[in-house]
């Protein structure tokens, strides 16, 4: 479980926890269901996390009532996300759209926003996201948790824990942005979620039938928690894009290479220097699908690709690794087929099955304005990661910077941070 769950026992910097439930105002027609795709089912042990921090000037006058009323408006648009999972006779999970609601969590913090943001390791923001996995009683388990944390100065932290089975990270950001608009008093509209037939993925590269970016794990039953033998640790930091590109990547004026691949290549090298791995080495890249026609729908449509190299990564140049990432193979079709074929009765991990890089750099996380003001800081991560680890790269408050959240086995983290220092990713 995530660090934030511990605060329920009064531990950590967030205290005075109160839980309630928020749902849609309009009842869903009896018997309505939402059917997950094979890709959805493959992601069922993963949970997405986001925490947005707003200043006292922005949020001081916002009350619990304001936030809940805006959530009513949001869930009127996407009411199926407030349902609960059940199983068919075959064992296949599906959502009963029974309007059971989302869990709303209130907490207090004795620090000001300025004091909170002064902490160099931003993984402290995990405390702003209340997480609880689905299960062991599926019919009583919310799919989304929303946490409101009031700072001493009047500032506000808004955190979401979002079951990946209902939609990818881009779906989470879309839903949060709608909520932020509703908080401000804007009218919001979300298009109807596509049918299961429209949501099923048709691969442009159907030759990839045996995806290596997904790993089967021991059966977990109805408690959807990734089984790991190793304890994982989080580390989050900001870096300057220019400082990393100039010394490590002689681009020679070529502006076509995305920043994400360059940063991922540098971080991949740092991790490879700590790990002794036989060749070939494979990593997973997860990105937004640029060709997705249903851009504003709650669904899993992210591109999940594998990158394999047959040379020592630790000794490779960043340019070689960027080139390899440009040849990534889209494996969604194979993952979709695996999820469909087992009817959700087998359990898998994608994040951390191989070392995984999640690209969120194309998302303007700071457009989530409340009362006309952007958040002071945004944090993103994933819960339920496999033992190979995850690197998330996303926008910072300053356009010339990026934020990197790293989750690795605890035994590796300090050695990897030493490599980060050698490469100038973090201060010595």
Curated annotation (Swiss-Prot):
Signal peptide bounds: none
Family statement: Belongs to the plant acyltransferase family.
Disordered: annotated span: 1-36
Listed InterPro entries: CAT-like_dom_sf (IPR023213), Plant_Fungal_Acyltransferase (IPR050317)
Keyword list, A-Z: Cell wall biogenesis/degradation, Cytoplasm
S-S bridge residues: none
A GO CC term assigned to this protein in UniProt: cytosol
Tissue: Highly expressed in leaves.
Full protein name: Protein ECERIFERUM 26
Organism this protein belongs to: Arabidopsis thaliana (Mouse-ear cress)
Disruption-associated phenotype: No visible phenotype under normal growth conditions, but mutant plants have increased levels of C29 alkane and reduced levels of C31 alkane in the rosette leaf wax.
Coiled coil: none
Pfam families linked to this entry: Transferase
A GO BP annotation: cell wall organization
Described function: Involved in biosynthesis of the epicuticular wax. Plays a role in very-long-chain fatty acid (VLCFA) biosynthesis and is required for C30 fatty acid elongation in leaf. Despite its classification as a BAHD acyltransferase based on sequence homology, CER26 does not seem to share the catalytic mechanism of the members of the BAHD family.
Main location: cytoplasm
Subcellular location: Cytoplasm, Cytosol
Low complexity bias locations: 21-36
